[in-house]
């Protein structure tokens, strides 16, 4: 990571950094502060550092631990934000850990107090005949199978509206990651 940060600095780029110690800190409350102090010590001084990537698409059961990680990082390094990306609204209630998508986003904002609410929504689907493929996990299989059921996944603007509503209610800015690179079952 240090080499990448140094290269990005030379190129005028900024990085939201991922480090395995952050992932370990989520599940290890006993060593959380120690792990995160080491992360901040290693990276906070790099001008190319934009922020710390905590996790992608968490279930609501993880929100209390994510809130603790976010707060520790904010206390140790108030200059660089801690980043968490949420599921889109086509995730199941089981994946979310909440009965509705709005409830999931609202609980995230209330529990984690993020600097920004971020989510991705990939609604352009190839729509090819479904083949039997094991993607390695139940979650990935669900996403893969759902992708072949529709050509244009519905709910893109409903997703924006749910997040916009929570954003306005909590005075937290939001961003959406849209599909720009064709991969897996997704198309441009």
Give the predicted meaning of each segment:
Residues 1-188:
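Glycan-processing catalytic domains of CAZymes
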